[in-house]
Amino acid sequence: MDGAYAFEKPLGFHDRPPALMARMEALTARWLELFARYGYRRVSTPALEFQATIGRYARVAPAKMFPLFDAEGRLVVLRPDMTTPIARLAASTLRSTPLPLRLSYAEPVFRLPQAGEEGQAERWQVGVELIGVGPGAGDLEALVVAAEALIAAGVPAPAFVVGDAALVPLVFAALRLKEAERSALETALLRRDFAAFSAAAGRIGGDVGAALAALLGPLQPERADALGRSLRALTRASGDAAAVDVARAVEERLSALLDLLADAAALFPDVRWLADPAFVPDLEYYTGIVFEGYGQGAGAPLVRGGRYDHLLGRFGREAPATGFALDLERTLAIVEVPLPPRPRTAIRIQKGNRRQAFEEARRRVAAGETVELVEEREDGIGDAGGAIGATGEGGAGHRAGGARTGEGGAGDGR
């Protein structure tokens, strides 16, 4: 390829050389084995999905999708997430499979970086979907397996932020906020701009503004009780029976969130658990518990997940569900993944012994060894520098005199 783009890559895409791929494969295998021990079975879905279904149900902004046309002229997209395609799979190919379904995956997802944005357009995700188990046990299982995954990767100082996607909308409904007020508050929370949220709550003022401000910060039992009392008082004063019921639902969800975190903390005392009632996820299909997992040195979440009880219904199979996705390369940026040594036996290909050299290579590979074929030219220089080792037994120069090299050594870019 000629021209200015001969060695360039599209915005958001990058090459993965052998050293990185070896680490990606090792950590992926570790995670998939962990998931298998918890009963999850691996699946795969197409990289291309119809925009009218997956593209719409994923609730990812159209500007962030890669649109294409298939051979019949239908609009398709590179999958922007894995949860929606697996929901389609569970409602179609696996429709007759009894629930619950425990499914795992390791696949890339694609989201188009916007102008001026930095980041990857192709991200490798490794994750699970638990379909057919409701809140409570299902939510705790998702948190347990996600925490186990961070620990298995060696993530330093793992921590989780856990919220409930229904809490903020319920609080807004109980307080009977105006549409403009809701929009300003929701936008601030989506951007994690808590100063803007506080300012918007301050403009509303009074007891309503104070109740909104109580959403911010880590949730403790005392704060949950205070928020519940505040909502009860405001809704009763309004005389709106529906608002009173909504306030009661908020209290129940706050209590369930704290109970869930208490169980998680008891199971993983070395993991930090933080309840955040103002956690607003960026995917609209979440209906309940949502969470993010971090580690020391990670500037962004290593794992994201949550409950999506209505997504499968859009494909015709009603079922509660939850799951999470780990960001493989983001995790590798902060952990060491030691690779087992893999010594290689060098086999020289000399003039007149080509067939014998490959016979020797096949024999050693069949015996479980790793080989490296070295072609020696007439000038005495081999394709690997001619210095991998002297000829050994075999009389035809098949063996490199015990010369062994380990993958991932000096110069391998790690």
Predicted regions located by residue number:
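TRNA-binding/sensing appendages of the translation machinery
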Residues: 1-84, 140, 161
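Positively charged, Gly/Ser-enriched RNA/tRNA-binding surfaces
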Residues: 2, 20-38, 49-50, 83-96, ...
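Beta-rich nucleic-acid/ligand-interaction surfaces
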Residues: 45-63, 163-173, 279-287, 381-382
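Acidic, His- and aromatic-enriched active-site or binding-groove loops in soluble protein domains
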Residues: 64-72, 177-199
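Short, basic, helix/turn surface patches
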Residues: 67-81, 187, 394-395, 399-401, ...
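Cap/lid and interdomain-hinge subdomains that line or gate substrate/regulatory clefts
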Residues: 134, 138, 161-162, 171, ...
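Hydrophobic mid-domain F-helix/FG-region of cytochrome P450s
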Residues: 145-152, 167-176
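Short, surface-exposed recognition loops or helix-turn segments adjacent to catalytic cores
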Residues: 157-168, 185-186, 274-280
